[in-house]
Swiss-Prot record:
PANTHER family: INTEGRATOR COMPLEX SUBUNIT 8. Belongs to the Integrator subunit 8 family. It comes from Drosophila melanogaster (Fruit fly). Residues 56-112 are annotated as: Disordered. InterPro entries: Int8. The gene is IntS8. It is found in: Nucleus; Chromosome. One of its GO terms (cellular component) is INTAC complex. This is Integrator complex subunit 8. A motif (WFEF motif) lies at residues 19-24. Residues 79-97 have a biased composition (Low complexity). Residues 56-78 have a biased composition (Polar residues). Component of the integrator complex, a multiprotein complex that terminates RNA polymerase II (Pol II) transcription in the promoter-proximal region of genes. The integrator complex provides a quality checkpoint during transcription elongation by driving premature transcription termination of transcripts that are unfavorably configured for transcriptional elongation: the complex terminates transcription by (1) catalyzing dephosphorylation of the C-terminal domain (CTD) of Pol II subunit Polr2A/Rbp1 and Spt5, and (2) degrading the exiting nascent RNA transcript via endonuclease activity. It comes from the Eukaryota.
Length: 1007
């Protein structure tokens, strides 16, 4: 029972004819081709006939009734088959040489004929008959037939025309004898087609070699195609030139020249008497056209111009009503050829004239732009570009023209701009740039030329432009108004109204520009305005003395509110604010509050120098005799604020080291000593934390051990300091203090414990890590978070490794209560932060690559690995060491490259392993690269393993990629890859290729 789900074959259409039906009925081919839309088409028929023709020579031909019987002689009741083996000996005829003439040669012994059986001969005749129906239009054949089938058709044409078996390409000393089955006229036609196709193939040589091959390549091998494309073209050029100069009549095939074989008539031959005689002009036009195309392709422009002119001349000499059988030149393509050669008879468009003017140093550019103002064919952006180019060329002396040319081009562009909808270029730039020159006459001249050609809508746009110029161009507006009166564009009422508006729009000219004023003081009779101006100056100033002067002025105005309340953004630390508010209301209270608020504001904006300067002035102010009661307390608090700002500045400018770090460390110890001594006044928590972190970055660990661990902000710095102290005392692989480990773990809890300290949370951890600067502290924090990541992820394939990681525990109680996502995000951020300060730390680069690979960011991981390898080789100047790139890292790079679709990069990386894994190599090579940067042949110069190159050669041979195969073979033949070389040469060769490959990876991933 048939499967109901099995798809049924689609029945053929009623009008579809199968190829073998044309063998049975010789007249069917003509009837089929005469249809309006034959199915299959003529091109499809040629493909089918060529595909079904076996490319093998038979030793004998069968009788009409049975092609399977091998008979060594012709039956007695039939005549010989012309040109077929087994017939009567073919008499000798004149030879077909590479030249135009067909010289007669002495008689030779009997030659072999076509060596084809009847099926082969019948199919070849049918394919040539269909090609003749298409008038041997090589453009159509080239467009619709694969290159190999074009060569098969050419081979069959030469074989039938000469009456003997020929191969393509023809040898250089080709002098084949025309047998009885051939014909001199036909051979001449076939040889002409051969040389034409040889030249045409050079134009598409690269595409022909890369074109997909038909599945059945029995009729032409890839090597024969390569040989045909590599054939010298000079003999073909000489042959076609001689043919153009010859006066000998030239015949082409008629459709009836090819007679299909009949099954009942074994003596049927070709009717070479029925051939078209074409005019010499038609022949020369076609040949000169193809010669001109070849000359253009090979950049022989003088010869191309001569050939194109000869083609056009011969084509014009053909009477208009003549039917063309051989010439297939399309007028548009001929015009393109003539334009390419610079001899076109058609008038150039305005854009073409514009481009030609640019090539000829702006010749006639003004007249072209004037014409374009009416036609508007040239893009306005191109005109603007030319204006700027002319300006630059004149200013640098490249263009020996006066500024008048630049002025005329700019004026014409202004006029064109009037009619550009949505243009961003206006007339303001023109008047501003050329104000010192006489810029009005060129503009008026351009407007007068344009006015007669304007439509009503364009006149309205022109009026708006003129009104804008009259009202906004100051001194030149009066002169322009007198000119506009003569245009006849405005009525008298409009002109009067414009005149009145010009009088009203004329402003008094200020002595200095408002934008150049040093302040924004507006002198007014209203005191509120003056007070507001003073307040704005007070808010914006950054100098303590200026603050003092402005406060004195504001105090004189008897303000209704305290002066320290002018700006709500002035924020003062609470201890200092308490002291200041306890002062009596006075100038000193306002001055202290304002300086403290502005200093903190400046420090937030990064202006540390002015902030410290203001606090220093305030400290000096409070040391006066009248402030003796609170001098010591106020100065101590201000000193701590100065220290806080300087610590922040030092951390922000860590690599510049602008401050004395030793002195800064001593002051930090003194500040923390106040907390340890139990003074009544201690620094605020932010200052204590900054001092502790600063000592941690200066590796001053002992002073931190004596502080109270219960102080919330100091918990993390103290735990890190204790860890470093224990690491110095530790002997062997002993686990260190767990305080830092437990504290770090508590940061990543999904729900923080109630009893935990106030330091818990990712935000407080990042606030601490943001101020880490020393490399060792970075390494300790990275190792802890990396260890937490390894334990929570629990995947050996994505384990991270770095320094100090062996110090931490290997397990965590209740790991599900911790957030792996927070760990990954924090570690990713911390590695980026650490690498911004120490970008050449190889272990961190590799760890960041491992982390990116674990989260699926393959490109970023590859970038980190490549950066590590480039850094480890001192930018590819030193050999790659195993401690930089071991097998573990290389295999991860291979995985990244494969995930990115760069299978050739993964293949080359396999050579970096201690022992090449050919299983991975062959798998990657068989994959199709999906990345445009991973061209297979781009990395042949980076391969030093000959086994790998041999596999690549075999792979290209299977795929039919001939040029790539040759390139791989040439790489195998280099001297440094010789298997007999000593080990030193082999190591040097591998090192050079490794360095070359690393540079290629760095160019792709790091630039």
């Amino acid at each position: 029972m048939d499967d109901p789900l099995k798809p049924k074959p689609v029945p053929l259409a009623a009008e579809t004819v199968l190829w073998f039906e044309f063998l049975l009925d010789p007249h069917k081919i003509t009837q089929h081709l005469q249809r309006p839309h034959p199915e299959p088409s003529a091109m499809e028929l040629i493909v089918q006939f060529i595909s079904m023709t076996p490319n093998t020579a038979q030793e004998s031909v069968g009788t009409p009734g049975s092609d399977l019987q091998n008979l060594n002689q012709t039956p007695s009741n039939s005549g010989p088959i012309p040109g077929v083996v087994g017939g009567a000996p073919a008499p000798t005829t004149p030879t077909a040489s590479g030249g135009v003439g067909m010289p007669h040669s002495p008689q030779r012994p009997a030659e072999k004929g076509l060596q084809l059986n009847r099926k082969q001969l019948a199919l070849k005749i049918l394919e040539l008959k269909v090609a003749t129906w298409l008038k041997w239009d090589l453009d159509a054949l080239e467009k619709n037939l694969p290159v190999i089938m074009q060569l098969a058709l050419l081979r069959d044409l030469c074989t039938i025309s000469y009456g003997c078996s020929l191969s393509i390409p023809l040898p250089n000393d080709f002098d084949a004898r025309i047998s009885a089955a051939g014909n001199e006229r036909a051979a001449r036609f076939a040889l002409t087609i051969y040389h034409r196709m040889l030249l045409r193939m050079q134009l598409i040589k690269e595409q022909a070699l890369k074109a997909p091959r038909p599945q059945n390549t029995m009729y032409q091998t890839v090597d024969q195609l390569q040989q045909f494309l590599d054939t010298p073209t000079q003999p073909s050029i000489e042959y076609l030139q001689q043919l153009c100069a010859s006066t000998k009549p030239f015949y082409i095939f008629h459709y009836d020249s090819f007679v299909p074989l009949r099954c009942d008539d074994i003596g049927n031959g070709q009717n070479y008497d029925v051939m078209h005689l074409i005019t010499p002009q038609e022949l020369r036009a076609q040949l000169h056209y193809e010669l001109a195309q070849y000359y253009l392709y090979t950049k022989q422009y003088v010869l191309a111009r001569e050939a194109a002119a000869a083609c056009n001349t011969n084509l014009q000499a053909i009477p208009p009503q003549t039917t063309l059988y051989y010439c297939h030149i399309r007028p548009s393509e001929l015009e393109g050829l003539l334009q390419a050669c610079g001899i076109s008879a058609e008038e150039q468009s305005l854009l073409e004239k514009f481009q030609q003017s640019l090539l000829n140093n702006y010749t006639d550019i003004v007249s072209i732009l004037r014409m374009d103002n009416r036609r508007r064919e040239i893009p306005f952006i191109s005109r603007r570009q030319v204006e700027l180019d002319i300006e630059g060329s004149i200013s640098t002396g490249i263009l020996k023209e006066t500024v008048q040319l630049q002025l005329q081009v700019a004026a014409l562009n202004v006029v064109r701009n009037i009619f550009e909808w949505g243009s961003i270029f206006g007339s303001v730039e023109y008047f501003e740039k050329y104000r010192e020159l006489d810029c009005l006459p060129p503009l008026v001249e351009a407007l007068q030329e344009m006015l007669p050609h304007c439509t009503f809508k364009e006149q309205a746009a022109l009026k708006h432009f003129l009104i804008d110029c009259l009202l906004h161009q100051g001194g030149q507006s009066r002169q322009l108004l007198q000119t506009v009166r003569g245009f006849g564009l405005f009525s008298s009422d409009e002109l009067q109204d414009i005149d009145e508006q010009m009088l009203q729009a004329t402003p008094p000219v200020p002595t200095n520009s408002l934008a150049s004023l040093s302040d924004w003081m507006c002198h007014s009779k209203m005191s509120r305005v003056d007070v507001g101006a003073l307040e704005r100056q007070l808010i914006s100033c950054t100098n303590a003395n200026t603050v003092r002067i402005l406060l004195v002025k504001l105090c004189a105005t008897a303000p209704g509110k305290p002066l320290w309340a002018i700006n709500p953004s002035w924020d003062v630390p609470q201890p200092l604010k308490t002291l200041i508010m306890a002062m009596p209301v006075s100038f000193l209270q306002d001055f202290s509050y304002v300086l403290l608020g502005k200093a903190r504001e400046l420090a937030t904006r990064g202006n540390y120098i002015d902030a410290v300067s203001m606090l220093s002035v305030l400290k000096s102010e409070n040391q006066r005799q009248e402030m003796a009661a609170n001098v010591q307390l106020m100065c101590k608090l201000i000193t701590w604020e100065i220290l806080h700002i300087q610590i922040t500045q030092c951390l922000e400018e860590w690599h510049q080291k602008p401050l004395d770090l030793q002195s800064l460390g001593g002051r930090c110890k003194q500040c923390l000593g106040a907390l340890q001594a139990g003074d009544s006044i201690v620094p605020r928590p932010d200052i204590l934390e900054s001092c502790a972190i600063m000592l941690l970055n200066l590796t001053e660990f002992p002073p931190l051990l004596y502080l109270d661990k219960r102080a919330g902000p100091l918990e993390l710095p103290l735990a890190f300091a204790a860890t470093f102290i224990e690491m110095e005392k530790m002997k062997g692989p002993k686990k260190v203090c767990r305080d830092a480990w437990e504290l770090m773990l508590s940061m990543f809890l999904n729900v923080p414990k109630r009893g935990s300290s106030g330091v818990g949370g990712i935000s407080s951890l990042q606030a601490f890590l943001q101020r880490i600067r020393h490399q060792s502290v970075f390494g300790l924090a990275i190792s802890m978070i990396g260890k937490v990541h390894n334990i929570l992820k629990d995947d050996p394939n994505h384990d991270l490794s770095c320094e100090y990681m062996q110090l931490w525990p290997t397990s965590i109680n209740n790991p599900v209560s911790y957030s792996l996502r927070s760990v990954c995000e924090t570690l990713q951020w911390l590695l980026s932060e650490a690498l911004s300060y120490y970008p050449q730390t190889i272990s961190w680069l590799k760890m960041k690559g491992d982390l990116d690979l674990a989260i699926g960011n393959n490109e970023s991981a590859m970038r980190c690995y490549v950066n590590a390898l480039v850094t480890g080789t001192d930018y590819c100047t030193m050999p790659l060491q195993r401690n930089v790139a071991d097998d573990y890292v290389i295999r991860k790079m291979i995985r990244c490259a494969a995930n990115l679709g760069c299978h050739m990069q993964a293949t080359v990386l396999c050579q970096f392993l201690d022992e090449i894994d050919y299983g991975i190599v062959f798998k990657n090579l068989s994959e199709k690269s999906s990345n445009f940067t991973d061209a297979m042949d781009a990395y042949y110069s980076c391969i030093w393993d000959t086994t790998l190159l041999e596999f690549i050669v075999n792979l290209h041979a299977k795929r039919g990629e001939h040029s790539r195969k040759l390139e791989a073979i040439s790489m195998m033949g280099t001297l440094e890859l010789n298997a007999n070389n000593n080990e030193e040469i082999k190591r040097e060769s591998a090192m050079v290729r490794k360095s070359r490959f690393l540079r290629a990876l760095a160019k792709q991933y790091l630039l």
